Amino acid sequence: MVKICCIGAGYVGGPTMAVIALKCPDVEVAVVDISVPRINAWNSDTLPIYEPGLDDVVKQCRGKNLFFSTDVEKHVREADIVFVSVNTPTKTRGLGAGKAADLTYWESAARMIADVSVSDKIVVEKSTVPVKTAEAIEKILTHNSKGIKFQILSNPEFLAEGTAIKDLFNPDRVLIGGRETPEGFKAVQTLKNVYAHWVPEGQIITTNLWSAELSKLAANAFLAQRISSVNAMSALCEATGADVTQVSYAVGTDSRIGPKFLNSSVGFGGSCFQKDILNLVYICECNGLPEVAEYWKQVIKINDYQKSRFVNRVVSSMFNSVSNKKIAVLGFAFKKDTGDTRETPAIDVCKGLLEDKARLSIYDPQVTEDQIQRDLSMNKFDWDHPLHLQPMSPTTVKQVTVTWDAYEATKDAHGICIMTEWDEFKNLDFQKIFDNMQKPAFVFDGRNIMNLQKLREIGFIVYSIGKPLDDWLKDMPAVA
């Protein structure tokens, strides 16, 4: 029986290994992590991450050919294939701070693999890493190997949170990069055989190591670029009276462009897009390509601009002050169908409103109060560095309340900011909400999911990104 071990039981490692175990009953899969609470959660009825369909997959396999353990060294020692799915956060200090990937966890994992291994292994990069990381890892393994042979493969994930299980069951492609040597080709074929249990051969792409590593960064950069492009258009639409939804539809019907990732919003979030683009910028700078680096920086700048523009719109619409006004924030996760708040636009929007002394009442069906308070009290990128959490700010705690009900969150509020496109928000009784709000009552739709005409008929003053402005909003101070 082939044995697979995955180091890292997070958003990538857990679901990916669960699906491999389900689709490959003849393969034994162990997911290991040094975090005892996380592994305990994976072994319980309440998994540590929310992902539609994940519970069912885990329950079918757990205890049969899928195991979760904190005994990292044992399972690495016994494995034929070791996936490494550890954090590669953005550095917060030192050379490349704010841009470069911090490979501390990856290096530690590589040294441990070399130290405990007693047989040849295939080591698979599953985390998103800079180009040429495999070369560095190879050197660490080789210089500490005690004669054991390692083959390094790059097998980046292309999952979208909220649809991760669906993506794993029916991937657009599986990408495997390896050394172009007889040993490298053999290692690629071994991993290919695992995925071939359920993925058609034509959808398994093989490349050299460096192409696979760069492809992941490029894919995320291209997706984020599309979001920033349509968001840049949304600002122009508001200025001219055009409707960004109509513009996006017209553009997306061009078969050369297509309709995906053309929904205007308050901005992109999640653990990958910003981090990977900053990493790409740093790689370009290190390779003497400042013009290319500057090009990709603009994707981040537009995303930051979109969030600040949204905050400015809220403040300017409400008589240029939200001081001591209650603002209901509906949604905090970076997208629907996940509880993940990493780099969610809601953080920057909430911080912007808090700087103007607003009182926030936040509701998200999948995000805990503890998580929200922690996110609002951390500096940028600290979410990915558990050891560097900032002390909670008493001011933030005082100004923020978290509820488990949208109606409670909106009661006596002056305005509502819709920050996540949860389906349940479309079906709320907005007449009831309006009746219990301060007047004039505002809705700021940061996800373009609401029936604007219906809200206006109820009596709301409505702002939706990239849509023609209400007369009220036209009369308010201009938003830069």
Swiss-Prot record:
Protein name: UDP-glucose 6-dehydrogenase 2
Keyword annotations from UniProtKB, A to Z: NAD, Oxidoreductase
Biological role stated in the UniProt entry: Involved in the biosynthesis of UDP-glucuronic acid (UDP-GlcA), providing nucleotide sugars for cell-wall polymers. Required for the formation of cell wall ingrowths on the outer cell walls of nematode-induced syncytia.
Keyword Oxidoreductase: yes
GO cellular component: secretory vesicle
Binding residues for substrate: 157-161, 216-223, 256-269, 334-335, 447
InterPro entries tied to this protein: 6-PGluconate_DH-like_C_sf, NAD(P)-bd_dom_sf, UDP-Glc/GDP-Man, UDP-Glc/GDP-Man_DH_C, UDP-Glc/GDP-Man_DH_C_sf, UDP-Glc/GDP-Man_DH_dimer, UDP-Glc/GDP-Man_DH_N, UDPglc_DH_euk
Catalytic activity of the protein: UDP-alpha-D-glucose + 2 NAD(+) + H2O = UDP-alpha-D-glucuronate + 2 NADH + 3 H(+)
Domain of life per record: Eukaryota
Family: Belongs to the UDP-glucose/GDP-mannose dehydrogenase family.
E.C. no: 1.1.1.22
NCBIfam families cross-referenced by the UniProt entry: NDP-sugDHase
Consequences of knocking out this gene: No visible phenotype. Displays smaller nematode-induced syncytia. The UGD2 UGD3 double mutant displays a strong dwarf phenotype and often develops seedlings with severe root defects; cell walls have an altered sugar composition. Ugd2 and ugd3 double mutants display abnormal nematode-induced syncytia.
Alphabetized Pfam families for the sequence: UDPG_MGDP_dh (PF00984), UDPG_MGDP_dh_C (PF03720), UDPG_MGDP_dh_N (PF03721)
Organism: Arabidopsis thaliana (Mouse-ear cress)
Gene Ontology process terms (BP): carbohydrate metabolic process; cell wall pectin metabolic process; UDP-glucuronate biosynthetic process
